[in-house]
Amino acid sequence: MLSKIMLVEDDFALAMATEYALQSEGYQVVCADNLQKARGILDESVDLVLLDLMLPDGNGYSFCKEIRDGGFEMPVIFLTAVSDEANIVQGLELGADDYVTKP
């Protein structure tokens, strides 16, 4: 069972709502609102990464690639408002396990 989820999301309200929902289900959630913070959090203890695509200091594609190039095998799920097929395919090709569009 997953226990530690890293949420990389720069929309404060969405991050807080997602964090609350996950914590109420018993998950430990660590949040980052940019890639610099996410890089500082990422380690083997993270069981799942929920990753926004558009962030203030880069994009989720590059971080997903960094995760995979670094040998990390935890699932990565894009959680983003960008829903066109080309972006979904690109995310999956870079190693994401799933791609969920947010409202």
Question: What is the meaning of each model-derived region?
Answer:
Residues 1-103:
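N-terminal/domain-start alpha-helical segments
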